[in-house]
Amino acid sequence: MISRKALGSLVCLSAVATLIWIASGNWKVHYLPYYLPCPGIFSKKLQYLGDKPVQLFPQLFYQQPRVLAPKRQDVLTVTPWLAPIVWEGTFSPEILDSAYMPLNLTIGVTAFAVGKYTRFVSRFLKSAEMHFMKGYRVNYYIFTDNPKMIPDVQLQPGRRFDVVHIKKYSSWQEISVRRMEAINLHIAERSHREVDYLFCLDIDMVFHNAWGAETLGDMVAAIHPGYFNVPRSQFPYERRSSSAAYIPDGEGDFYYGGAVFGGLVKKVYEFTKICHMTILADKANGIMAAWQEESHLNRHFLTHKPSKLLSPEYLWDDRKPKPPEIFLIRFSTVDKNYQEVRN
């Protein structure tokens, strides 16, 4: 038996088809002030599992955006595939927070403190509490081979950090390539139930200015501070064709840093899984890519373009002088003796 609702939909569709057939003939078209009684079609609202309901922007007062007067004319603010590049002056934190705050999001952060890198945990967390996603719930996941060396840092309400015990490896290169695997397993086992977005950051870095909702996106990559103003022929891509991270000469958009990436937790899960698989393929062939997981990250983003790019403001190197294009530095590496901390 056909239900009354289904029968109503069929009648509605039949009426629409009849009107189209009439209009397509040679008859003169008349526009009638008549609306078909099809409320069942238009009243359906689907909410997929895990999705947050769309929020309306509240009434805000801000300067009118001007089409012919962009705030930034000195830098590229959108990629050829229409992904925004986030620079200071290209967004309004107030407008973004008015949209994202009502969603009650939880933002996750993974960082690896292995070996001597535990010394950077306290400064990383204290600076994050001052600048990272203020007003949002945040879960910090600190991966370490020595949980006893992780300090207890006072966090704001609604924010917590968990220590994730991982295996100790013999070299920093092995630690580097194992990072994708560890993040992927943690998402599968736990964090996919706990966070909406996940950022994967290096622990030997410090927040200096606000890092907020402007960084949220499906899949987010950060432009490397060492290569944002040079031609791609100078990018340190993996150039051996035998590697799964291989990028031929003449290809590539930007050089992305491995110290910062993130996005929706389900997107980060897929990304880390693919990168881990390509790393395993190289390992089976006795190959380690030029810059370990960073090389595989760049290869992936060549064919799977990120939906949002963060300017070098979000991944700076304190040893470099600040160029005029960088209005402020939000997140930067700690000056250190790499040989000493990696031994």
UniProtKB/Swiss-Prot annotation:
Catalytic machinery residues: 294 (nucleophile)
Swiss-Prot/TrEMBL keywords: Glycoprotein, Glycosyltransferase, Golgi apparatus, Manganese, Membrane, Metal-binding, Signal-anchor, Transferase, Transmembrane, Transmembrane helix
Record SUPFAM superfamilies: Nucleotide-diphospho-sugar transferases
Positions on the Lumenal side per record topology: 28-343
InterPro entries linked: Glyco_trans_6, Nucleotide-diphossugar_trans
TM annotation in the entry: 7-27
CDD domains: Glyco_transf_6
Positions that bind Mn(2+): 202, 204
GO biological process terms on file: carbohydrate metabolic process; lipid glycosylation; protein glycosylation
Cytoplasmic side: 1-6
Pathway(s) annotated for this protein in UniProt: Protein modification; protein glycosylation
Free-text comment on the cofactor: Binds 1 Mn(2+) ion per subunit.
EC nos: 2.4.1.-
Gene Ontology MF annotations: globoside alpha-N-acetylgalactosaminyltransferase activity; metal ion binding
Subcellular location: Golgi apparatus membrane
Record membrane topology: Single-pass type II membrane protein
Annotated glycan sites: 104
Cofactor requirement: Mn(2+)
Pfam families according to UniProt: Glyco_transf_6
GO cellular component, one term: Golgi membrane
Residues reported to bind substrate: 112-117, 202-204, 224-227
PANTHER family named among the record's database cross-references: GLOBOSIDE ALPHA-1,3-N-ACETYLGALACTOSAMINYLTRANSFERASE 1, GLYCOSYLTRANSFERASE-RELATED
Family: Belongs to the glycosyltransferase 6 family.
Function according to Swiss-Prot or TrEMBL: May catalyze the formation of some glycolipid via the addition of N-acetylgalactosamine (GalNAc) in alpha-1,3-linkage to some substrate. Glycolipids probably serve for adherence of some pathogens.
Name the UniProt record assigns to this protein: Globoside alpha-1,3-N-acetylgalactosaminyltransferase 1
Species annotation: Gallus gallus
Lineage, broadest ranks: Eukaryota, Metazoa, Chordata, Craniata, Vertebrata
